[in-house]
């Protein structure tokens, strides 16, 4: 791995300051955290599958995943309060940059017919979210160890509240966005 954090500090910050015309280096956008989450859906009732999902995310992230629980009971979804409904892990600092580098260099190129990730995942507050359909694109996941194939949502939280600045930051970090037609 070539050190994405050093790349950000030595090259990306300089380019961002020039392109966004920001004089104060403390105002430059930076990546604050990455959240990887999985909603279990129909598998929420089976605790073995929930444990397997959490273990898979832990392998991918390099950090222990937390099983998320329902805050309220919803009769339409047959969910009771306190029931396990998914898993998530929040990455910061070194683990965040290591995961992002692995995602860009190794995992996303393994996606079948990959033409870049959508530019439509920005939320208006400088955060970017996209989904991955299956966990097998990550080299840590062994096919024989998974009980059920599942996707995941990856949210990148930046320090800026502007989508344009967040897009520029992620683009300069090397995130492969789809080309505009």
Swiss-Prot record:
GO biological process terms on file: translation
Keywords assigned by UniProt, alphabetized: Ribonucleoprotein, Ribosomal protein, RNA-binding, rRNA-binding, tRNA-binding
Heme recorded as keyword: no
NCBIfam families assigned to the protein according to its UniProt record, in alphabetical order: PRK00010.1
Keyword RNA-binding: yes
Function: This is one of the proteins that bind and probably mediate the attachment of the 5S RNA into the large ribosomal subunit, where it forms part of the central protuberance. In the 70S ribosome it contacts protein S13 of the 30S subunit (bridge B1b), connecting the 2 subunits; this bridge is implicated in subunit movement. Contacts the P site tRNA; the 5S rRNA and some of its associated proteins might help stabilize positioning of ribosome-bound tRNAs.
Family annotation (PANTHER family): 60S RIBOSOMAL PROTEIN L11-RELATED (PTHR11994)
Species annotation: Helicobacter pylori (strain HPAG1)
InterPro entries: Ribosomal_uL5, Ribosomal_uL5_bac-type, Ribosomal_uL5_C, Ribosomal_uL5_CS, Ribosomal_uL5_dom_sf, Ribosomal_uL5_N
Molecular-function GO term, any one: rRNA binding
Domain of life: Bacteria
Protein family: Belongs to the universal ribosomal protein uL5 family.
GO terms under cellular component: ribonucleoprotein complex; ribosome
Pfam family, one: Ribosomal_L5
Record note on quaternary structure: Part of the 50S ribosomal subunit; part of the 5S rRNA/L5/L18/L25 subcomplex. Contacts the 5S rRNA and the P site tRNA. Forms a bridge to the 30S subunit in the 70S ribosome.
The protein, known as: Large ribosomal subunit protein uL5
């Amino acid at each position: 791995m070539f050190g994405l954090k050093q790349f950000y500090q030595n090259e990306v910050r300089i380019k961002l300051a020039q392109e966004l015309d920001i004089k104060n280096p403390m105002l430059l956008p930076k990546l604050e955290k990455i959240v990887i989450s999985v909603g279990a859906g129909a598998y929420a009732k089976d605790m073995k599958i929930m444990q397997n999902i959490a273990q898979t995310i832990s392998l991918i992230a390099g950090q222990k995943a937390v099983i998320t629980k329902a805050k309220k009971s919803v009769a339409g979804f047959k969910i009771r309060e306190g029931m396990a409904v998914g898993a998530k892990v929040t990455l910061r600092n070194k683990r965040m940059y290591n995961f992002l580098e692995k995602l860009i260099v190794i995992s996303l190129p393994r996606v079948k017919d990959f033409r870049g990730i959508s530019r439509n995942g920005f939320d208006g507050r400088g955060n970017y979210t996209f989904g991955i359909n299956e966990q097998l694109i990550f080299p840590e996941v062994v096919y024989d160890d998974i009980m059920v194939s599942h996707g995941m949502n990856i949210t990148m939280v930046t320090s800026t509240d502007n989508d344009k600045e967040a897009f520029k930051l992620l683009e300069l970090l090397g995130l492969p966005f789809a080309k505009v037609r």
